[in-house]
């Protein structure tokens, strides 16, 4: 109940919460709390595609992204959140992965993430 209004707006959230109305996957996608709609037979393949896309990123970058996103979810002050220090971001900046990304890009090859 606390997060839904932030994701889809107070009007839509209250409409759903006060009436108990269920929404279809398509409506959930239009409202912005569903990422993708697939046929049931394609569900596993779609989930694997999402996992494959995430897997291609640096593990340290994923960790830092999640930390910043979760820690700032309820922070209304953008300037404050931009100035905050995040341990995972600091670790990323000093890592081999931080160097590997631009090098791989410059060499036109896929990066070899080490997670360190």
Predicted regions and their residues:
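A general structural signal for well-ordered alpha-helical segments in protein cores
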Residues: 1, 10-13, 51, 61-66, ...
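Structural motif
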Residues: 31-32, 108
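Helix-loop "lid/cap" segments that line or gate small-molecule binding pockets
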Residues: 16-17, 68, 72, 87-93
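C-terminal long alpha-helix characteristic of the crotonase
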Residues: 25, 34-83, 112-116
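Terminal peptide-recognition signature
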Residues: 4, 28, 65, 105
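Acidic, divalent-metal-coordinating active-site segment for phosphoryl/phosphodiester hydrolysis
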Residues: 20-27
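CoA-thioester-processing core
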Residues: 1-17, 30-31, 46, 50
């Amino acid at each position: 109940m606390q997060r839904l209004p932030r994701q889809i707006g107070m009007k839509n959230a209250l409409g759903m919460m006060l009436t108990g109305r269920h929404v279809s996957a398509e409506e959930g996608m239009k409202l912005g709390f569903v990422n993708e709609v697939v046929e049931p037979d394609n569900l596993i393949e779609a989930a694997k595609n999402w996992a494959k896309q995430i897997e291609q990123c640096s593990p340290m970058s994923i960790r830092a992204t999640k930390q910043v996103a979760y820690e700032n979810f309820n922070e209304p002050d953008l300037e404050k959140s931009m100035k905050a220090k995040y341990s995972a971001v600091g670790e990323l900046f000093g890592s081999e992965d931080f160097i590997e990304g631009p090098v791989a890009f410059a060499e036109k090859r896929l990066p070899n993430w080490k997670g360190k």
